[in-house]
């Protein structure tokens, strides 16, 4: 056991985590040069296209250190984006140490900070690594000072490396062996294995990634899932090197996979404990706190007969992505679908893309909303995540919106424009401190403003230099209203949004104008209205198409022309009474773009 080292790699987006993982795999000979490819651990197509890590991946490598001993390194490459912090905290629970990778050109960023504090709270040994020293703008000394100043860990002897060129990788490996403590555990105690991650394989059933805390697990053992007492036989046990390799045994302190032919999707949930059927452990290991979704949206299959396969796809995805929440929903405009909860807008985009690619389902997604607390005269306080669930205006005493604490790190020259942006988004500044050339500002912002497009705007106002990390703080009373969209005097429930009263009129106007462009013209006028309760705040009209009915009249009396025009007018009137307006798919997407 003293030769095992479990560690994670944590960093801000684009600081080179996945490339560093590639180098570690290459140096330790995990894959041959022919099998090696860029970002070998980013196995999903979406990860490669976007250049981001979404799922944490684990790898076991054997490394011969300078002291002549062979060490088993189990490491987990984690995502860097703020939407996937849950993946990071889960990975850290399986480790004793963490490599904190910082770009030597850009320095410390907000997500570096957040992930590092998570690691320190879990009592992990944090090893700073300065990456990208081959870049012309790299300034390792300044960045080392920044790490000490902002995070407060000793970084003067931090390893300097370039994951791209391979410089300094050997030093990184030696630091891991020297500084990361070996795991502790009792190999003779009853088996306790923590499930860190799981996914569904169509041929093998549920594949679980586990960390053995006590005891050992062999292929052929009868194992019990402690949350539901189901008993299975461990068919295959092994590690990822990064290829799936059967070893037949996992010992105390190791990280590997177990396949037990579990066919029901939630048969071995993440955070659960596996033990032996006969010599069972008395207690479960403390799992992970259930994460609450921050953003909700309705998802509906375009073809109504795909509903069951859509449910199936969501079930399989939720096994692999424990932070996805969903429940059935029915909309008058869109039929049957699901109300889904996500950690943020990027998470929502990724899930939608994975459903369309991996499961081949075409979806319509409604406008995302956050959770609001509503206090009513009749039913007291309750939470809603869907604008159409909001009770009648005269029954509401107050609406409370969620407020987040946003920590922003920004270079001094862009501070002014970032403060302006935060004020526009109804933010309240609570803290500001200077660290060298960087400024750390803390704002309390409404979550609804942050999840929509705040991240994109922050990046564009600071030319990409500002970084953001946020977490939920509390609910606060606010003047929120529901803006309904009426098409031909009929309410379309899927187009409703909740907005602040100050911005409701402009949001309503933008929505009406966007719909005017997208809904095709009919044979009669279509009125598009935005309304709060019974009060219309914006209106626009799509003009009818009309045939020139008097083209065939040559001369003759004017009453002949009037008669034809009146006949046409009456026809249009009848048509309007019975005519239905189809709202195209693009109209629902337009809401997502409004306000950007």
UniProtKB/Swiss-Prot annotation:
Pfam name, any one: EFG_C
Record-listed GTP binding positions: 14-19, 131-134
Gene, per the UniProt record: lepA
Origin superkingdom: Bacteria
tr-type G domain location: 2-184
Function: Required for accurate and efficient protein synthesis under certain stress conditions. May act as a fidelity factor of the translation reaction, by catalyzing a one-codon backward translocation of tRNAs on improperly translocated ribosomes. Back-translocation proceeds from a post-translocation (POST) complex to a pre-translocation (PRE) complex, thus giving elongation factor G a second chance to translocate the tRNAs correctly. Binds to ribosomes in a GTP-dependent manner.
Catalysis: reaction(s): GTP + H2O = GDP + phosphate + H(+)
NCBIfam families: lepA, small_GTP
Family classification: Belongs to the TRAFAC class translation factor GTPase superfamily. Classic translation factor GTPase family. LepA subfamily.
Protein's name according to its UniProt entry: Elongation factor 4
Record's keyword terms, sorted: Cell inner membrane, Cell membrane, GTP-binding, Hydrolase, Membrane, Nucleotide-binding, Protein biosynthesis
First-tier enzyme category under EC: hydrolase
HAMAP family: LepA
GO molecular function list: GTP binding; GTPase activity; guanosine tetraphosphate binding; ribosome binding; translation elongation factor activity
Entry EC no(s): 3.6.5.n1
Gene Ontology cellular component annotations, sorted alphabetically: plasma membrane
A GO BP annotation: positive regulation of translation
Subcellular localization(s) per the UniProt record: Cell inner membrane
Membrane topology, record value: Peripheral membrane protein
This protein's record includes keyword Ribonucleoprotein: no
InterPro entries: EF-4, EFG_III/V, EFG_V-like, EFTu-like_2, G_TR_CS, LepA_C_sf, LepA_CTD, LepA_IV
Keyword Endoplasmic reticulum: no
């Amino acid at each position: 056991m003293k030769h095992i080292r479990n560690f994670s790699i944590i960093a801000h987006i684009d600081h080179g985590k996945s490339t560093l993982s590639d180098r570690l795999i290459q140096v330790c000979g995990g894959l041959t040069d022919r099998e090696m490819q860029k970002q070998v651990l980013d196995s999903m197509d979406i990860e490669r296209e976007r250049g981001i890590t979404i799922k944490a991946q684990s790898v076991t490598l054997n490394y011969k250190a300078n002291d002549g001993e062979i060490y088993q390194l189990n490491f987990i490459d984690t995502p860097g984006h703020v939407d996937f912090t849950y993946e990071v905290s889960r990975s850290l629970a399986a480790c004793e140490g963490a490599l904190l990778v910082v770009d030597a050109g850009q320095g410390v960023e907000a997500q570096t900070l957040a992930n590092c504090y998570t690691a320190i709270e879990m009592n992990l040994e944090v090893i700073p690594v300065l990456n990208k020293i081959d870049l012309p703008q790299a300034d390792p000394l300044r960045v080392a000072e920044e790490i000490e100043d902002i995070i407060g860990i000793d970084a003067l002897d931090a390893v300097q490396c370039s994951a791209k060129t391979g410089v300094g990788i050997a030093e990184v490996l030696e630091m891991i062996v020297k500084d990361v403590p070996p795991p502790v555990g009792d190999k003779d105690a009853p088996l306790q294995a923590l499930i860190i991650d799981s996914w569904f394989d169509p041929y093998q059933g549920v594949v679980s990634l586990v960390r053995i805390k006590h005891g050992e697990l062999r292929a052929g053992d009868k194992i019990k899932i402690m949350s539901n007492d189901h008993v299975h036989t461990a068919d295959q046990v092994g590690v990822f090197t990064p290829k799936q390799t059967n070893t037949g045994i996992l010992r105390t302190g190791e990280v590997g996979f177990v396949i037990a032919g579990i066919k029901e999707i939630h048969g071995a949930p993440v955070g659960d404990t596996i033990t032996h059927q006969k010599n069972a452990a008395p207690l479960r290991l403390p799992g992970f706190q259930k994460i609450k979704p921050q953003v909700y949206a309705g998802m509906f299959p375009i073809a109504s007969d795909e509903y069951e396969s859509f449910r199936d796809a969501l079930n399989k995805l939720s096994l692999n992505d424990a932070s996805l929440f969903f429940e059935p929903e029915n909309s008058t405009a869109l039929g049957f679908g699901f109300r889904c909860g996500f950690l943020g807008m990027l998470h929502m985009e990724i899930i939608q893309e994975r459903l369309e690619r991996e499961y081949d389902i075409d979806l319509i997604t409604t406008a995302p909303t956050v959770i609001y607390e509503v206090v009513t005269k009749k039913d007291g306080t309750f939470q809603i995540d869907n604008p159409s669930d909001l009770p009648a205006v005269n029954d509401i005493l107050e609406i409370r919106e969620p407020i987040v604490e946003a920590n922003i790190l920004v270079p001094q020259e862009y501070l002014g424009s970032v403060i302006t942006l935060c004020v526009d988004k109804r933010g309240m500044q609570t803290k500001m401190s200077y660290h060298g050339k960087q400024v750390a500002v803390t704002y309390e912002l409404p979550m609804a403003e942050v999840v929509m497009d705040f991240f994109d705007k922050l990046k564009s106002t600071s030319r990409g230099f500002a970084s953001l990390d946020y977490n939920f703080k509390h609910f606060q009373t606010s003047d929120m209203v529901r803006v309904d969209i009426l098409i031909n005097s009929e309410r379309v429930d899927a187009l409703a949004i909740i907005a602040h009263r100050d911005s409701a009129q402009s949001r309503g106007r933008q929505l009406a104008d966007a719909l005017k462009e997208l809904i095709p013209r009919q044979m009669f006028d279509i009125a598009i209205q935005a309304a709060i309760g019974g009060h219309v705040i914006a209106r626009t009209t799509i003009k009818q198409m009309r045939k020139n009915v008097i083209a065939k009249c040559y001369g003759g009396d004017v009453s002949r022309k009037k008669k034809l025009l009146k006949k046409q007018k009456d026809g249009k009137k009848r048509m309007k009474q019975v005519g239905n307006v189809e709202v195209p798919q693009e109209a629902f997407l337009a809401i997502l773009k409004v306000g950007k």
